[in-house]
């Protein structure tokens, strides 16, 4: 159960970077291009731009979505959070006031691509 969906705070950058780093390391097809520190800095930059909404579960950030205008720049969940409706709720939260959204996803990310199709996105 999600405690809250809220705008990300500067103090969330570390947890967001950890989620990104874990995904990068645990996903076979994902290029291992960035250090944990670089991913924390990237998360901080998205937060500073006001792009990020986080999902808090049990008092901890367990997922986030970043939107720049009509583009979804990132949607990541912590390990073990998939298939609980968190990604869908994050998408719903950022759709307010936006008639059109687009995103890019790795072709190899089959699970995410199926998720986006179920949410009404097209290829």
Residue ranges and their predicted role:
Residues 50-66:
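Conserved beta-hairpin
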Residues 1-11:
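Conserved N-terminal entry element of GNAT/NAT acetyltransferase domains
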Residues 72-83, 105-106:
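A short, internal acetyl-CoA/4′-phosphopantetheine-binding micro-motif in the GNAT/acyltransferase core
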Residues 77, 83-96, 114-118:
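Conserved acetyl-CoA-binding loop-helix of GNAT-fold acetyltransferases
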Residues 96-108:
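Conserved GNAT acetyl-CoA-binding A-motif
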Residues 13, 17-44:
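Conserved GNAT-fold acetyl-CoA-binding loop/helix
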Residues 65-67, 121-122:
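Short hydrophobic beta-strand motif reused across regulatory alpha/beta modules
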Residues 42-54, 71:
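A short helix-loop-beta-strand connector motif used in the catalytic cores of GNAT acetyltransferases and
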């Amino acid at each position: 159960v999600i405690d809250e969906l809220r705008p990300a705070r500067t103090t969330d950058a570390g947890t967001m970077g950890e989620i990104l780093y874990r995904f990068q390391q645990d996903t076979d097809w994902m290029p291992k291009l960035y250090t944990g520190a670089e991913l924390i800095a990237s998360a901080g930059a998205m937060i500073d731009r006001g792009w990020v909404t986080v999902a808090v579960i049990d008092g901890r950030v367990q997922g986030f979505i970043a939107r720049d205008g009509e583009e979804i720049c990132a949607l990541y969940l912590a390990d073990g959070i998939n298939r609980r409706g968190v990604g869908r709720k994050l998408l719903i939260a950022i759709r307010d006031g936006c008639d059109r959204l687009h995103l890019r996803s790795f072709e190899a990310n089959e699970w995410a691509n199926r998720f986006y199709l179920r949410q009404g996105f097209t290829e």
